[in-house]
């Protein structure tokens, strides 16, 4: 876990040396790459990863060497590769190249001149256009006004039923305005009401008004008056007295 994660970026550590004296050596160009940032007090610097604080710098001190001397297990040094596990891999003269002496020293610090890419400022974001992507054809519109089958979705829809043409005129009735006349002179039947005009049928005949012996039968339950051969009315729905016209002769 990092000690001061706010200083993980190299640029932030460099900017922390704003109050660092120009006469002090080493300077920000060598301290910041080694993981140190300035604390603002004297010449004390601190590692952002392990939290090591170092003071009393000499002009000949190497920040990488001093860092590894006091904090060899620093995560930043291990990740940057500044620590070499075998001191035999450094040089044939350990006394001059290896700052560590003694039988227990098994590490040598190799100074670095620049921080690794992992701890540097990330590059600014760039805008790139997305590659063209083939768009699949749109699915068919759901409805009932198509007679074809889609090849992509394999959906079939029934055709919409064709409505009959609108009625523009009504034919006239064959036997007058709502009347049907039987061929028998004694059984005329009125269906809807009075005959057209002044009581004439479609042939122009006037209805009979004489009191003959054979009275016609009313359909709607009303007896015809007069005559000697009175007939009983049939059962009907409405008490309407029909007007009887002469039969239509074919």
Swiss-Prot record:
CDD domains: BIR. It comes from the Viruses. BIR repeats lie at residues 13-78. InterPro entries: BIR_rpt, IAP. Signal peptide: none annotated. One of its GO terms (biological process) is regulation of cell cycle. Pfam families: BIR. May act as an apoptosis inhibitor. This is Putative apoptosis inhibitor ORF99. It comes from Ostreid herpesvirus 1 (isolate France) (OsHV-1).
